């Protein structure tokens, strides 16, 4: 695969690369040597960073392969999401329930109370570990796509009239309960079902 196909995640191929090159040749470019040097330096930096990212992802893959966590058995759970979730939560015995993990991630509903007034439109708190919240959100989207049980649950919540993000937050709570159960029991998803 060429670098444009890789960088565009498969959206553009060789034809688009040729089209871009021809457009660049036909366009009016700067003849200043400083700009050319800056462009070469920037390209070199991008290539070095891409190489470092590949090394880090390889290291993460090796660590996850050694740990072999049960949450990877959930259809749709990716290695990077699993790594962030496990790293942010750490020791699952520090949490007495899945709700504590949700609160730690800042995914529990906020409450507003003043005198006799109680907030009836609770919003997600968005306190806590934003990395865990982001990883759980992304993992939930993929799990809902690849796992028929979660896809059905998300469709059910949408049929109840809930906004997509609200329905997804319900699926996220379900996913956290599943992750908690799998990690505590050591069972894989297929054997737990």
Regions found by a protein language model. Give the residues of each.
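A detector of single, family-specific signature residues
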Residues: 1-193
């Amino acid at each position: 695969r060429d670098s444009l196909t890789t960088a565009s995640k498969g959206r553009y191929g060789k034809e688009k690369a040729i089209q871009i090159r021809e457009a660049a040749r036909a366009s009016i470019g700067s003849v200043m040597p400083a700009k050319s040097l800056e462009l070469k330096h920037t390209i070199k930096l991008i290539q070095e960073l891409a190489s470092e990212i590949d090394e880090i992802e390889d290291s993460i893959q090796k660590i996850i392969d050694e740990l072999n966590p049960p949450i990877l058995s959930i259809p749709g759970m990716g290695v990077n999401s699993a790594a962030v979730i496990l790293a942010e939560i750490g020791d699952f015995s520090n949490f007495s329930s899945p709700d504590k993990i949700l609160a730690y991630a800042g995914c529990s509903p906020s409450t507003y109370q003043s005198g006799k007034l109680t907030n009836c439109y609770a919003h997600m708190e968005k306190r806590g570990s934003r990395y865990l919240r982001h990883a759980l959100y992304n993992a939930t989207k993929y799990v809902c796509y690849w796992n028929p049980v979660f896809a059905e649950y998300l469709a059910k919540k949408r049929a109840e009239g809930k906004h997509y993000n609200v329905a997804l937050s319900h699926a996220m709570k379900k996913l956290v309960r599943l992750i908690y159960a799998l990690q505590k029991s050591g069972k894989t998803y297929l054997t737990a079902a």
